[in-house]
């Protein structure tokens, strides 16, 4: 199809004016139109929540296709596989509609081709695309195309641990052993456990995987902080802050003495304040660092007089309330200022100490870099040996291919008309490098919202988006910036609440983006612009004594939601459901973590509210039914394992009680007192135990049955797969059926079924055997890892419980954000190593410091841990980035709501009101306050307090225990579907009669519609070929008639009784088809090109040797072969198709699926060709055999493109000479 020019700026403006003047109920915004039709340069679309970014992407793609761009000429990267599938579905629907409306044959043909090509279009995650690149071009790096993905974190950890041990041993035995010991002890201290050091190595490795070039980052950036430490600049920076703090204190003291201080005239503290002002008077702009330091020390010394109360205003008990309040306000405002100055004094002392010792740690940091580099290389080599890679490896291989081989890079750059990416704010540097390499510099289209960048833990870097946003905003020649801020999802009340919070919370200093008019959410849906007071956002704070049973849990675990918060939420859900008729499916609970939500599940079950929790929690191996099966397998592997054997005996499979096990434990033999439980079991069976009288006849039978069952399983395990063994256990003891009768039976059965599948997948890898499988599971558990739980079908009308991360991109009518008082996770800030993309590594260094002491018993050397200067700088960067991401998490959570938003926390009104939230600065909370706050709740409460004179769009209400009694909470008003006495009224005879009637009717239907029942819903051309063949289908064999039976036949091979399997015709056929697909068609292929293509074929060497390349070469000398070369842009190879057919016997329709070897697509005709490797003597036999199959292919092509002229060719490669036969 001939290309249609893209719209000019003037034409886009006209389109915008026409849309604005139209009477459509829902119009496109001017910004949406601009994003759909703009072209000719890089475009960044900043799309706020609910602004219709997916709609814009779909419409832009459709517009480009309607202008003649093929879907195969678009690269579209999505954040998830699910998003890619949804995008394809939308495009399929839009293309189908466009095809119906198309009038010109040329456009119809073009659109039909795009529909056919859509399943194979490059629409997917960057990981899926890099896999394609590596499969196709991995041979350039010496990599096999049949690699597998190491997706399991547990499997990765096992390999990492093995490689780490090898590299560690190498370094420990090297000439740098002394320095290496110092490095290890720096992180492990006196502990012999290496886990602390190993953990830091793995953290650095994980960070490396997100860089575009790990080796280059290690070489150029890793040591940057230590090689460029500027203590003078750091002092200058600190002293600038000190001067500001001192002047702030001077202003505060002066104002105090001038105004409210008069009420305290003559008080002792005022003399100290006056002395401080005298000292502060010596500070000016020209004061040197030394002078400023001296003034700081004097102020700190003054503040420490009177036991640190020198500046404290005191009033007597009998003073009036106003005076008490004035003293309180003064003291609370003064306290943080003095504390800040004291911290500066300490900071200067520490800086001097660090400067003396930091150079000592440089050799350690260099050695750490070398160790990580060697570990990364050794780990990569191990993965190459396994032919299994992580996604990061595959991305780096793809980048290496595109950077190293210009011809490959040009291929992709010339192929793609546009490089599009969704969720651009969550891009990491590896992905950004890939996008750069695929684009031509001015053909990128990027969509995202920096306010929704919440995947820093996956190494996403919102700075990539932010830098482009600023660059395009300041200089349009670099690219076009389009901002979509109209929200079509939410009601006005949700948007106003979100704006009211974030315009007072988020700016570039704390938040990494200035939330101003550019980013304010605007209601775009006319139906949702009308105010509705009932939808006003609610900030509900539970103030009571109901706690979570896990309140005193480990510090490392997420903070659990309190019982009172859950009751509060349940009460409101019951009200919504009973009074407003809100369906459960319209309600969603959001939490920061998917763990420790058991209290929520139990409470909802108690109140009979259906709840579907977020899937994917890694607790599969902790489920009871899986634990029982693992102990069963451990016992089969090694019966001498007392723990596993005891667990198996006590399990429901054998049901031994405590008394029976106690009797068994007393059956040690006469000769040995210390025996395993299994040996005691054998003794009991043979009557050789010390206390045979304790073994009753019933217990004897039970033990005998157990012993025989166990032995049968052990015997079976030696000759069968793990999968078969597991299912034998399920069937022998009816364990699978039994767990299905328990609570959550479907989930339990799914877990058991998944165990068999995981065992099967395990044996497909390079690992084999029960012992190694058990060993792998045990290593996973030892490292405190687990496997993801198995999802099961959920009820349709149920409240959903999910994490904020999981909710991104989704929308729900009613949203409850729980646990607002949960403290932010700041574990990264306490790590011994902190990494920065630009500043490299920063470590905590343990220095050996000599001290002079008089006491002979005191140590003369101390080990002191210090935060090196690069560590401090990286920490400040990390804390700001973490805090900014927490703001974005809150933004994502709040913008999920369509109708009403509930923000739920826990706290004391008295305590919250006592907090000093400070004053506003330029319409926001002060930067220092925002930085110090550690949970969502305090942010919102501070906004309410500081801006109390403004009409905020959310209401705050405290809820007490009195409001959460059982009577106040209420219950769901649902009719009882199955009364308790129903079962008592049933009669068994009626049930049996009804069941027999049903079975009889089923039998009649089966007989009546047998042909339709036996008809498969999907067939392939090979399966229905017999309907078209005039003779018996013996695909791949010679067909002999009566006369041919007496002709002399070619000799045949004798049976091969060796170890090597004989090459089959099917194997050769598959290899030939793959070879024909890989041959480049840019010119007539030489033998060298054919050999290179053959090397890429995924087949055994024995199979490849059966392929005669001379025949392939001669094909390209035929008329058809030359036609393919001359029209390579029109050639389609290995094209899948699907077509609806009707079965003559049943009259039912079925889907015919297949893959075409290839065809040439012209405007008025199609040339279809098919390769056949069948042995033959007479080509007419093959033509007769495959005519029906080719007719089906031709029919499918004709339907797809609306072209009736189809030429059909068979390319016969199984004879002595190549033949290209036209089939009429």
UniProtKB/Swiss-Prot annotation:
One of its GO terms (molecular function) is 3'-5' DNA helicase activity. PROSITE patterns: UVRD_HELICASE_ATP_BIND (PS51198), UVRD_HELICASE_CTER (PS51217). Residues 26-491 form the UvrD-like helicase ATP-binding domain. It comes from Streptococcus sanguinis (strain SK36). Its EC number is 3.1.-.-, 5.6.2.4. It comes from the Bacteria. ATP binds at residues 47-54. Keywords: ATP-binding, DNA damage, DNA repair, DNA-binding, Exonuclease, Helicase, Hydrolase, Isomerase, Nuclease, Nucleotide-binding. Its cofactor is Mg(2+). The keyword Hydrolase applies. This is ATP-dependent helicase/nuclease subunit A.
């Amino acid at each position: 199809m001939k290309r249609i020019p893209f719209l000019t700026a003037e034409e886009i403006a006209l389109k915008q004016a026409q849309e604005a003047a139209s009477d459509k109920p829902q119009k496109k915004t001017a910004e949406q139109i601009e994003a759909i039709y703009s072209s000719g340069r890089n475009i960044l679309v900043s799309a706020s929540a609910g602004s219709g970014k997916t709609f814009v992407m779909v419409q832009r793609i459709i517009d480009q296709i309607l202008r003649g761009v093929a879907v195969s000429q678009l690269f579209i990267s999505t954040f998830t596989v699910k998003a890619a599938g949804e995008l394809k579905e939308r495009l399929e629907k839009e293309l189908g509609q466009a095809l119906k409306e198309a009038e010109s044959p040329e456009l119809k043909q073009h659109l039909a081709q795009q529909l056919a090509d859509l399943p194979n279009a490059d629409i997917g995650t960057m990981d899926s695309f890099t896999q394609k690149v590596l499969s196709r071009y991995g041979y350039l790096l010496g990599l096999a195309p049949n690699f597998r993905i190491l997706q399991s974190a547990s499997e990765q950890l096992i390999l990492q641990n093995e490689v780490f041990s090898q590299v560690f041993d190498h370094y420990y035995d090297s000439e740098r052993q002394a320095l290496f010991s110092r490095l290890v002890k720096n992180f492990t201290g006196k502990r012999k456990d290496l886990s602390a050091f190993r953990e830091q190595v793995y953290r650095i490795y994980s960070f490396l995987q997100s860089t575009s070039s790990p080796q280059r980052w290690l070489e150029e950036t890793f040591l940057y902080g230590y090689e460029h430490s500027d203590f003078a600049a750091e002092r200058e920076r600190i002293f600038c802050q000190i001067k500001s703090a001192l002047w702030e204190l001077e202003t505060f003291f002066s104002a105090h003495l001038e105004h409210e201080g008069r009420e305290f005239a003559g008080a002792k503290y005022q003399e100290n304040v006056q002395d401080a002002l005298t000292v502060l008077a010596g500070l000016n702009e020209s004061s040197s660092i030394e002078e400023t330091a001296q003034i700081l020390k004097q102020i700190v010394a003054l503040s420490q007089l009177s036991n640190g109360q020198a500046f404290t205003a005191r009033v007597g008990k009998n003073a009036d309330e106003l005076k008490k309040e004035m003293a309180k306000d003064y003291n609370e405002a003064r306290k943080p200022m003095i504390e800040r100055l004291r911290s500066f004094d300490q900071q200067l002392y520490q800086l001097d100490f660090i400067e003396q010792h930091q150079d000592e740690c440089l050799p350690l940091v260099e050695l750490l870099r070398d160790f990580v580099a060697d570990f990364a290389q050794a780990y990569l080599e191990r993965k190459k040996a396994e032919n299994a890679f992580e996604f990061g490896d595959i991305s780096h291989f793809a980048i290496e291919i595109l950077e190293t081989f210009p011809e490959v890079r040009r291929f992709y750059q010339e192929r793609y008309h546009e490089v599009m990416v969704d969720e651009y704010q969550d891009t990491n540097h590896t992905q950004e490098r890939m996008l750069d390499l695929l684009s031509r510099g001015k053909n990128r289209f990027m969509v995202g919202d920096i306010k929704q960048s919440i995947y820093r833990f996956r190494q996403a870097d919102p700075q990539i988006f932010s830098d482009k946003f600023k660059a395009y905003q300041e200089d349009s020649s670099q690219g076009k910036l389009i901002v979509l801020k109209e929200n079509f999802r939410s009601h006005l009340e949700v948007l106003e609440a979100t704006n009211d919070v974030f315009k007072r919370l988020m700016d570039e200093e704390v938040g990494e983006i200035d939330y101003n008019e550019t980013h304010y959410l605007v209601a775009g849906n006319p139906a949702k612009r009308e105010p509705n007071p009932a939808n006003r956002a609610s900030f509900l704070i539970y103030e009571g004594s109901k706690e979570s049973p896990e309140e005193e849990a480990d510090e490392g675990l997420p903070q659990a939601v309190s019982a009172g918060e859950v009751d509060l939420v349940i009460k409101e859900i019951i009200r919504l459901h009973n009074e407003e008729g809100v369906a459960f499916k319209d309600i969603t609970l959001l939490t920061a973590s998917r763990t420790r939500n058991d209290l929520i599940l139990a409470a909802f079950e108690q109140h009979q509210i259906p709840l579907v929790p977020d899937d994917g929690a890694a607790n599969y191996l902790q489920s009871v039914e899986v634990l029982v099966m693992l102990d069963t397998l451990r016992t089969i592997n090694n019966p001498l394992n007392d723990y596993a054997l005891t667990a198996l005996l006590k399990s429901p499979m054998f049901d031994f009680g405590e008394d029976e096990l106690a009797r068994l434990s007393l059956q040690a033999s006469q000769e040995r007192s210390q025996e395993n439980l299994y040996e005691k079991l054998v003794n009991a069976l043979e009557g050789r135990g010390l206390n045979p009288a304790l073994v009753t006849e019933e217990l004897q039978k039970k033990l005998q049955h157990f012993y025989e069952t166990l032995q049968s399983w052990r015997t079976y395990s030696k000759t069968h797969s793990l999968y078969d063994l597991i299912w034998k256990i399920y069937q022998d003891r009816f364990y699978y059926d039994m767990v299905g009768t328990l609570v959550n039976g479907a989930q339990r059965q799914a877990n058991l079924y998944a165990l068999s599948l995981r065992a099967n997948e395990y044996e497909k890898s390079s690992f084999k055997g029960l012992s190694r499988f058990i060993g792998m599971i045990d290593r996973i558990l030892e490292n405190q890892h687990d496997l993801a739980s198995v999802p099961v079908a959920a009820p349709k009308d149920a409240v959903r419980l999910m994490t904020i991360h999981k909710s991104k991109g989704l929308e729900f009518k009613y949203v409850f954000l729980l646990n607002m008082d949960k403290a932010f996770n700041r574990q990264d800030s306490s790590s011994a190593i902190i990494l920065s993309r630009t500043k490299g590594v920063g470590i905590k260094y343990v220095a050996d410091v000599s001290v002079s002491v008089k006491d002979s018993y005191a140590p003369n050397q101390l080990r002191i841990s210090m935060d090196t200067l690069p560590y401090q700088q990286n920490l400040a960067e990390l804390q700001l980035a973490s805090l900014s991401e927490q703001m974005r998490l809150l933004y994502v959570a709040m913008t999920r709501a369509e109708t009403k938003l509930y923000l739920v926390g826990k706290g004391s009104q008295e305590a919250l009101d006592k907090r000093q939230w400070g004053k506003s600065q330029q319409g926001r909370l002060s930067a220092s306050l925002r930085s110090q706050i550690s949970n969502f709740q305090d942010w919102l409460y501070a906004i309410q307090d500081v801006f109390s004179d403004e009409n905020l769009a959310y209401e705050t209400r405290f809820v007490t225990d009195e409001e959460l009694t059982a009577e106040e909470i209420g219950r769901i008003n649902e009719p009882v579907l199955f009364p308790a006495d129903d079962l008592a009224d049933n009669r068994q005879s009626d049930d049996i009669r009804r069941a027999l009637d049903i079975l009889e009717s089923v039998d009649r239907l089966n007989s009546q519609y047998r042909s339709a029942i036996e008809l498969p819903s999907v067939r392939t051309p090979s399966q229905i070929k017999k309907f078209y063949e005039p003779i018996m289908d013996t695909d791949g064999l010679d067909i002999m008639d009566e006369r041919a039976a007496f002709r002399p036949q070619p000799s045949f091979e004798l049976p091969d009784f060796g170890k090597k399997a004989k090459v089959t015709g099917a194997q050769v056929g598959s290899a030939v088809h793959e070879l024909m697909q890989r041959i480049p068609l840019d010119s007539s292929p030489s033998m060298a090109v054919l050999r290179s293509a053959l090397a890429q074929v995924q087949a055994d060497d024995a199979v490849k040797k059966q392929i005669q390349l001379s025949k392939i070469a001669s094909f390209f000398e035929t008329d058809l072969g030359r036609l393919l070369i001359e029209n390579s842009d029109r050639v389609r190879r290995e094209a899948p198709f699907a077509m609806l057919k009707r079965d003559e016997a049943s009259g039912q329709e079925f889907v015919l699926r297949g893959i075409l070897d290839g065809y040439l697509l012209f405007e008025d005709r199609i040339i279809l060709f098919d390769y056949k490797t069948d042995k033959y003597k007479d080509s007419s036999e093959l033509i007769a055999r495959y005519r029906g199959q080719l007719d089906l292919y031709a029919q499918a092509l004709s339907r797809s493109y609306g072209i009736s002229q189809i030429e059909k060719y068979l390319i016969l490669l199984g004879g002595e000479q190549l033949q290209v036969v036209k089939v009429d």
